[in-house]
Amino acid sequence: WDEAKKIVLDAYTGFNPRMGEIASRFFDENWIHAPVIQGKQGGAYASYGTKKSHPWIFTNYTGTANDVATLAHEMGHGLHMFLAGEKQTLFSMYTPLTTAETASVFGEMIVFQDLMKKESDKEVQLAMLTEKIDSTFATVFRQIAINRFEDAMHTARREEGELTTERLSELWMSTQKDMFQGSVTMRDEYKQWWSYIWHFLGAPGYVYAYAFGELLVLALYNLYEQTCDSFIP
């Protein structure tokens, strides 16, 4: 955890000292719950405070590289929420989905780029790039496919009435096949994978924002690399 903390803080501070200062408060003032304990739900998210209270970060840290990326992602949310509470009114501090996911994915990109610059082993760099490409595919193409499944599910419900698990699985496989286009073999067990995605019940219509955020961050970071210091207010 201490290593993950250092990785995130070094990257955020290197990008902008003010970002590093705010991120440090999340660690120093215990605004993050990271231990995996009995009865704790899985996943990760950031939660708004109010004008008078700070945001919180919820995650389950097990020491993997993906957990570090998740921490960087949620810290992006956390900083966005903190600054919104500081600069905006109570009625304007809550951001739309697309803007929220842009902030979090940008936080991931900051940490990834910082690690890439510090890594001298070409094979490790290649492994990191491969993982990043895989992550980008999941964030853009897969989330769009999931969004199309969700749209198809609601459309079918309106037109056909109550849907069976078999019908939902059929819609799931159809939209997944549109994405993979025969590049992978999808076994029968994969038909049920729609059932583990909590967004369909907990945050309907959400997942397209991940794809939007990823694409906008790629454009924004490219602009940052071209303009450097003038990019940062």
Locate predicted features.
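Cation-handling catalytic/transport regions enriched in His/Asp/Glu
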Residues: 1-233
